[in-house]
């Protein structure tokens, strides 16, 4: 609370506007000036400074997002270049390795992507096998290594590629990597 001095005439005017016993001078003035009942923080910011602050915040957030994507790309490329991946002949295992790499590199992004990527009549991802098995007869589900997710694996090689590229697009992976995966599962 701050103390201010007012002349007698103003004091009597404010006092005459009292509506309830115990109402403070601040409450009366707020009501008379049509201000909110609770004090609001007041900061004087010049418009161009506010715009600069907003721009710097946006650029910082974009830089962090870009750094996370770069880390994801590096981890994913490491898997693509690894001897284990290159020498693997079974597409199902390659499919699972790449999904695992995506999950390890960006768990939240992967979780968001799996929630979005679905087929017209089939769910491709779930957090347990039973959820996938309920989606239809003949569904083969496998656990994605090092993740809590399961994926349907009895799809054609081309469909596996579509699933992978859809997840990668949802995770905002660069188009050159998406194209590279598309070629692997063509």
UniProtKB/Swiss-Prot annotation:
Keyword vocabulary terms for this entry: Cytoplasm, DNA replication inhibitor, DNA-binding
SUPFAM superfamilies: Replication modulator SeqA, C-terminal DNA-binding domain, Ribbon-helix-helix
Pfam families recorded: SeqA, SeqA_N
InterPro entries, per the entry: Arc_rbn_hlx_hlx, Ribbon_hlx_hlx, SeqA, SeqA_DNA-bd_C, SeqA_DNA-bd_C_sf, SeqA_N
Function: Negative regulator of replication initiation, which contributes to regulation of DNA replication and ensures that replication initiation occurs exactly once per chromosome per cell cycle. Binds to pairs of hemimethylated GATC sequences in the oriC region, thus preventing assembly of replication proteins and re-initiation at newly replicated origins. Repression is relieved when the region becomes fully methylated.
Compartment annotation: Cytoplasm
Cystine pairings recorded for this chain: none
Family affiliation: Belongs to the SeqA family.
Organism of provenance: Haemophilus ducreyi (strain 35000HP / ATCC 700724)
Gene Ontology terms describing biological process: negative regulation of DNA-templated DNA replication initiation; regulation of DNA-templated transcription
Protein name: Negative modulator of initiation of replication
Quaternary structure and interacting proteins, as annotated: Homodimer. Polymerizes to form helical filaments.
A GO CC term assigned to this protein in UniProt: cytoplasm
GO molecular function: DNA binding
